[in-house]
Amino acid sequence: MGLEEQGRAREDTPLLGKGRPLSSKFKTFANVFIAIVGAGVLGLPYAFKRTGWLMGLLTLFSVAALINHCMMLLVHIRRKLGVSNIGSFGDLGFAACGNLGRFVVDILIILSQAGFCVGYLIFIGNTLANLSKPTKSTTLMSLRHLMGVSPKSLYIWGCFPFQLGLNSIKTLTHLAPLSIFADVVDLGAMAVVIVEDIKITVVQRPQVVAFGGMSVFFYGMGVAVYAFEGVGMVLPLESETKDKDKFGKVLALSMLFIAVMYGSFGVLGYMAFGDDTMDIITANLGAGVVSSLVQLGLCINLFFTFPLMMNPVFEIVERRFWSGMYCVWLRWLLVLAVTLVALLVPNFADFLSLVGSSVCCALGFVLPSLFHLMVFKDEMEWKQRALDVGILLLGVILGVSGTWSSLTEIFQE
């Protein structure tokens, strides 16, 4: 196997690359954190505003428990099959139900990864447009009136040529360390927002609600599922763990820690701003220097995370349509498609809910429970069978209802 082939990414390739030594418990914990925590957390306060803080918390912790359970289902399936070359979700789909299984997983991974990148562009466009609101006539305003486009669209199109260049890189080894930067900036932004939330809450106590009603339940589920999406990384992470018998415990503790962090962030953000909570919480921080630096930092980290998240899409599309060979024009077409979708979607949090309700529900709930049913069908007790069927049906119901709810919200904008 040549060096170039070894450097090619697959849908199971961790963003930080695969290290030679196996991972300790702490490193596994950190890898789970990096694989899951992303920009979705910034939409949680707005989701709590829609669902109510108590319903939001219940939804968040329920989704965390379900995602953790379904991740472990994938691990149990691989151990049961005992096939050494099952390294990714797609490989497991093929082992469980042949080419159809791999095809379905591939399609959903393409949609989910591309959906994340659409969300990144929406965030960048909306944030930069918010930061650069002119107080008088400027070149930006002149361009807007001349071209008939919004500032958000101008910023997204401004990213486009640079993304073409970044996504033309065959191997992302040199960009991979930026995923560490992305998580550091995310944590920094969360810390700044939490501090500001506490300071604002002490001064003013806006009215908040505990339950927003069942009409927004599926909306909240979609945002929560998006925020915890990372099921495709569980197999490579488990493969790299030194003490595999303790992997389930480490994963559960990681998910609990992330859920507590997410819940605190969402509740404090909503408690601070109440009905004025915006779809991207950093926009509530005002126009100060610290706020601007945090928002610019988030834009930069998402800008460089974009090609990392698109890499699994390129791998799948090139494997299926270009014999696995590098194809720059195919990559450019995919980047163009993602850009065009980002231009059409107005609201960051609404889009999180759409992707979470549709694609992430299928990847996180439906497929793991379905594959588990198929592989363990001859030795399952009725309780386990009922649990798998229940999760499968829940995933389908949440997917259909949440997708409809999110599309309704988007088209009402």
From Swiss-Prot:
Main location: membrane
GO BP term, example: neutral amino acid transport
Entry's transmembrane regions: 28-48, 55-75, 104-124, 146-166, 175-195, 208-228, 250-270, 289-309, 332-352, 356-376, 391-411
GO molecular function term, any single one: neutral L-amino acid transmembrane transporter activity
Domain of life according to the entry: Eukaryota
Keywords: Amino-acid transport, Membrane, Transmembrane, Transmembrane helix, Transport, Vacuole
Family to which the UniProt record says this protein belongs: Belongs to the amino acid/polyamine transporter 2 family. Amino acid/auxin permease (AAAP) (TC 2.A.18.8) subfamily.
Protein role: Translocates preferentially neutral amino acids from the vacuole to the cytoplasm.
Protein name as catalogued: Amino acid transporter AVT3B
Organism, scientific name: Arabidopsis thaliana
Name of the encoding gene: AVT3B
